[in-house]
């Protein structure tokens, strides 16, 4: 943030009721800023009944408990908390796209899209309209003068999910946890006596109530059972619908006899799932890929060819690559083979700690 505006900024903090956003709000409040908590109400379906036919699984997104926790934290810190209803834009931009991508044979990352179009992008617009100078969140990343960097805690770094941001958005974004480790954040939550200090982190997609998103897909997509084959043409069994599988997947491929088997290719025209029985099979690997919908955080495309590091999915190790133009898209060539290159996932480019940009695998 600008040095001359070091104190008493008007900041809207996205508060989910979790530990990270709660500590982010507490830190800013203790620094003397005028902080207001914003709880975002996203779309969620009615909780599906459990196996006994009674009750259901509580949706992790925008649950009553999450809102209650956010209010308890706001009261403890001493700041007002408001609820903004983003359910329509969330359903249209995130949920509908998530289902459409799976139906078309791609494996999307809804968190990337949500940060750009809803949680941060849309919130910034609304917050600015309401007179806030900045929006803050509990993301683990660092924003230094409009340049995005990895967080101090590399095990929790979330810069991968933020590559779609632009300069106008970064200008109004604060990430108070960027220079803290998760352990330090937990310690601060206890020090500040926040009521969510012991609350567990959520690891799954927020708008899906179950631990596995396949049940969600089964409810919302038209799935066609089909054949599971080897590349030699041998029929091994039947799949329950291609959107339920992703490249490199092992779990959930129900084939009797020898195994294990790994999903290697989906032929949507013929509705066939091709598998291999060796996790190191060359057909699970690739040396290049093409990306679309590319965003460069600086606002301008870099000089090509670009030699940098790429992350092909969240939590994956950075690998050396070269980026060149290929028609209207970009071609990414790796120095070593990469396993399970998955259409629909994001590739994010780095130079050391700095995020350059990224795109979606075609």
For each of these PLM feature ranges, what is it?
Residues 16, 136-142, 147-362:
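AMP-forming adenylation/ATP pyrophosphatase catalytic core
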């Amino acid at each position: 943030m600008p040095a001359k505006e070091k104190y008493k900024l008007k900041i809207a903090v996205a508060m989910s009721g979790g530990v990270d956003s709660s500590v982010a709000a507490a830190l800013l409040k203790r620094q003397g800023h005028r902080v207001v908590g914003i709880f975002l109400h996203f779309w969620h379906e009615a909780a599906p009944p459990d196996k006994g036919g009674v009750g259901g699984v509580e949706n992790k997104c925008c649950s009553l408990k999450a809102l209650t926790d956010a209010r308890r934290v706001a009261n403890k810190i001493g700041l007002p908390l408001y609820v903004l209803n983003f359910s329509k834009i969330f359903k249209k931009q995130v949920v509908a796209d998530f289902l459409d991508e799976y139906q078309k044979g791609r494996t999307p990352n809804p968190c990337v899209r949500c940060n750009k179009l809803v949680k941060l992008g849309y919130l910034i617009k609304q917050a600015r309209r309401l007179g806030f100078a900045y929006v803050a969140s509990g993301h683990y990343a660092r924003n230094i003068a409009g340049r995005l960097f990895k967080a101090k805690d590399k095990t929790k770094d979330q810069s991968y999910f933020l590559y779609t941001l632009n300069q106008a958005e970064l200008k109004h974004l604060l990430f108070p946890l960027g220079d803290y480790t998760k352990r330090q954040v937990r310690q601060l939550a206890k020090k500040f006596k926040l009521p969510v200090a012991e609350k567990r982190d959520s690891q799954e997609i927020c708008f899906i109530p179950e631990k596995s998103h396949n049940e969600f897909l089964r409810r919302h997509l038209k799935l066609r059972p089909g054949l599971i084959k080897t590349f030699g043409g041998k029929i091994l069994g039947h799949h329950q619908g291609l959107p339920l599988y992703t490249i490199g997947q092992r779990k959930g491929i129900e084939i009797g006899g020898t195994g294990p088997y790994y999903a290697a290719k989906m032929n949507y025209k013929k509705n066939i799932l091709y598998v291999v029985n060796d996790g190191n099979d060359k057909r699970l690997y690739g040396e290049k890929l093409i990306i679309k919908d590319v965003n460069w955080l600086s606002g301008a495309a870099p000089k090509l060819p670009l030699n940098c590091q790429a992350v092909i999915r969240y939590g994956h190790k950075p690998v050396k690559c070269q980026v060149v133009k290929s028609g209207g898209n970009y071609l990414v060539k790796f120095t070593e083979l990469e396993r399970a290159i998955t259409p629909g996932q994001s590739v994010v480019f780095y130079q050391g700690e700095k995020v350059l940009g990224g795109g979606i695998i075609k």
